[in-house]
UniProtKB/Swiss-Prot annotation:
PANTHER family: URIDINE KINASE. This is Pantothenate kinase. The keyword Kinase applies. GO terms for molecular function: ATP binding; pantothenate kinase activity. It comes from the Bacteria. Pfam families: PRK. The keyword Nucleotide-binding applies. Pathway: Cofactor biosynthesis; coenzyme A biosynthesis; CoA from (R)-pantothenate: step 1/5. Its EC number is 2.7.1.33. Keywords: ATP-binding, Coenzyme A biosynthesis, Cytoplasm, Kinase, Nucleotide-binding, Transferase. One of its GO terms (cellular component) is cytoplasm. It is found in: Cytoplasm. ATP binds at G90, S91, V92, A93, V94, G95, K96, S97.
Amino acid sequence: MNEFINFDEISRETWQNLYNTSIAPLTHDELESIRSLNDEISLQDVEDVYLPLIHLLRLYKKNLEDMSYSKGLFLQKIVKTPPLIIGISGSVAVGKSTTARLLQLLLSRAFPKLTVDLVTTDGFLYTTDDLKNMGILDRKGFPESYDMEKLTSFLYHVKNGERFEVPIYSHETYDILPNQSQIIDSPDILIVEGINVLQNPQNQLLYISDFYDFSIYVDADEKLIEKWYLERFDSLLKLAKYDQTNFYHQFTKMPEDKVLNLARETWARVNRVNLREYIEPTRNRAEIILHKAENHHIDKIYLKKF
């Protein structure tokens, strides 16, 4: 069966003409401040792709409010509108983080009186020590390396308007930061970004996908993602060259050809396997798929029909 049978394929040209918005435009500096390493994004991308997406999210927000009001009428009591939770998934190096930060910025502009928070699922990885004790350090990034029960609990508490402390993950130390956390306290909109956002653990009464009001999958050809991964790896090495506390500093002492081989092996052994077996199979669970071509150019949008 065609995986996209339940999606409308929309060209960028058609998509950009679907809605003209009055949201204040971003500056080049604002866009640069949220851009991830080696990700390509332009003000034209914001105008053509993301502003129409913001309008679509407005419709989902309004629908959530209307449903809460109608439920209150039925129950004959006040029903508070729960936060709109948006999930963003996709492979490593595909540009999820940039998309998440951009949406946070644009939604804050679209809803200036509302709180828009952003959380990455990296914070729900087990610590390096825990992974070692569990004997799965070499499986870091795979589903079993995440505390999915804690992630589900977090989403449950947020949906119920309750405060939650989220662990903070550092890409510099490649581990959870001890005694540090991000406080999430009753946001109006929450964006959750990570490779496992659409994955559902087995034997759970509640699935992660149950909590999302809207979900996005950032997609690209596997060969392109590999290219972007290798480019990002190289950029991380350059940043770590003079920082001995950085996880990637250890690789700066190696010959360039050996480092490149290591990066390729890591992609083939970990990231490609993870993409094929666990990440890409969740693609059709998303409400919308943003498809990227060369230079991170979004050329097609797939919107779920029902």
